[in-house]
A protein has these predicted regions:
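Hydrophobic helical membrane-anchoring modules
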Residues: 1-7, 18, 146, 170-261
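Short loop->beta transition adjacent to catalytic acidic/histidine clusters or analogous donor-positioning motifs
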Residues: 4-7, 27-38, 56-57
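Short, well-formed alpha-helical segments that are part of the catalytic scaffolds
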Residues: 15-29
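Donor nucleotide-sugar binding loop of glycosyltransferases
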Residues: 16-19, 43, 66
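A conserved acidic beta->alpha catalytic loop
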Residues: 40-48
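Acidic donor-binding/catalytic loop of UDP-sugar-dependent glycosyltransferases
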Residues: 45-46, 85-102
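Acceptor/aglycone-binding surface of glycosyltransferases and processive sugar-polymer synthases
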Residues: 62-64, 68-76, 94-172, 203-213, ...
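Short aromatic/hydrophobic "clamp" motif used to bind/position activated sugar donors
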Residues: 82
């Protein structure tokens, strides 16, 4: 619970049998998570049994792909604040508080893994992936004149329930480049968002995408083509996010009250 709102964490799993139980328990251990929803996307044998040892709720998405699993999770989660994360141990559960702090002011809070000081030794964020994610994010920032962006592929993201449903109902990408589509749909809908740095740790096991350089390049190219298609269809002048509902500029007292909720 955060500020009187239920918090759901959505994990999409395919090859994370050895880490998913610890990740689920880590999020419940933060004390602010009311629900962990796991979308089993044809996961490896034994994964469902590991999930069953926890308090998490499990749903099954037979259509293979990150986008299909994410869409299912956004629609199924019961919380008023919905946080997407990975079950592979790369994210710190306590970093959820960084996202929640901004949820009072923004309908979407996006994590970024490209802050050098928060990339842990051994994390799968070598120069190619780091600068590739940064470059594609900057392409979006420039083409759509958005707020600051530095990571197109970070799963660690928070959405209010309405924003989550709006994204899910308009998603078309079922594959690994769906993260870029989610970001683009957030932007073109005029959703107020902000990006915050999160820790990025070594993965437990091998990623089916970023663990193979050629696949990572292919996903990057798919993202760029998707961005260009969105830009061609989008209006010349993008909708501005709604103004904050404050009758005065935020003060240190306001920030203190938010943190204490």
């Amino acid at each position: 619970m955060w500020g009187g709102k239920r918090v759901s964490v959505v994990l999409m799993t395919y090859a994370e049998r050895d880490s998913i139980r610890a990740v689920i328990e880590g999020f419940f251990g933060t004390g602010v998570v009311d629900e962990v929803l796991v979308v089993n996307n044809n996961a490896q044998a034994g994964t469902a049994e590991e999930i069953a040892k926890t308090k998490a709720r499990q749903v099954f998405e037979p259509r293979q792909g990150y986008g299909h699993a994410t869409r299912r999770g956004l629609l199924e989660a019961s919380g008023e604040l919905i946080v997407l994360a990975e079950p592979d141990g790369t994210f710190v559960p306590e970093d959820i508080r960084k996202l929640l702090v901004y949820s009072d002011e923004c309908d979407a809070v996006l994590g970024t893994r490209t802050t050098r000081e928060l990339i842990w030794h051994g994390a799968n964020m070598e120069w190619f992936l780091r600068w590739g994610n940064w470059a594609v994010a900057k392409l979006i920032e420039v083409l759509f004149n958005t707020s600051h962006l530095s990571d197109v592929g970070c799963t660690y993201r928070l959405f209010g329930r309405k924003a989550a449903r709006r994204v899910a109902e308009t998603m078309t990408v079922g594959g690994s480049h769906a993260g870029a589509e989610i970001l683009l749909l957030t932007i073109v809908s005029g959703t107020r968002f902000v990006e915050v740095p999160v820790n990025y740790l070594p993965r437990v096991g091998i990623s089916s995408v970023t663990g193979e350089p050629l696949k990572a390049v292919a996903v990057g190219l798919q993202m760029i083509l998707l961005i260009l298609r969105f830009r061609r269809r989008a209006p010349r002048r993008m909708p501005r996010p709604a103004a904050l509902g404050l009758d005065h500029p935020p003060t240190s007292e306001d920030a203190h009250e938010r943190v204490e909720l």
